[in-house]
């Protein structure tokens, strides 16, 4: 699991934790800000790293898969251990460095007040991070700053990615097992989406809606790379899917971009939502995957504005009627480059010609 923060967010997090330690030292002891900051970082950062799946990932998954009472008790026990070990490590470091005048034992054993402080400091930070994770980074920051209090028109790219054969899987697995299956599938998408600067806007049944600002999506074909990274990750873990569920996910994906209107809606529950033909067209394009028997489709409008990765082949499928759209949509299929029959590699990043392919000669 990748570290899910930007460099600026990491710096701010460190400053908040260190600042709280300095404040505690000044209030309780009347000084020693550096010592307080050191203790705070050593005690709180392991807890935050654990909550962000950076350390002890298996233990984290096991705890979060437990019933609520066991989850609460186990979490508190882990936090208690982290605080004590962190305090002891900080105390030993400060004592060896000659900063602490107390005995080594006193420097390494936390008082009850210190334990309460550590949990009181970590708790609100963990709460904010969980809200951030629930909403997504971009949505969290947009809601926090009120960016979309008034409707804003902007250009975005959307990726609709859907699980093929979900109905038969649900009948075979049952509701609970199917939800677990979908949960792991969506979790597998998280890292590629973050890696390529996207954000998961919503989950609709067995489908995920992923979006980027237009410039970010077309830069180095990030939106296309994201799709194939997701597919590659599923394929790489095929043995695990087969072992755990007896079924490897088969996905369909559609990419399209254009002008939309973004707005913050709701009173008791707020949400940033996107309106416009672009969103509807992407959803219809994903439906064409089934009709055309293709795994990944992209609109010609979007493909014109980016350069596909060298490992991707684009096959022109012509123009197709899209429900709710007044004009036909030019569509292409994307596949990872493969070997032809004579062992030669297909021209990567090029469009396979068909009568309507001339529009893409500039790619």
Swiss-Prot record:
Pfam families: Guanylate_cyc. Binds 1 Mg(2+) ion per subunit. SUPFAM superfamilies: Nucleotide cyclase. Residues 341-363 are annotated as: Disordered. The keyword Lyase applies. Belongs to the adenylyl cyclase class-3 family. Plays essential roles in regulation of cellular metabolism by catalyzing the synthesis of a second messenger, cAMP. This is Adenylate cyclase 2. The gene is cya2.
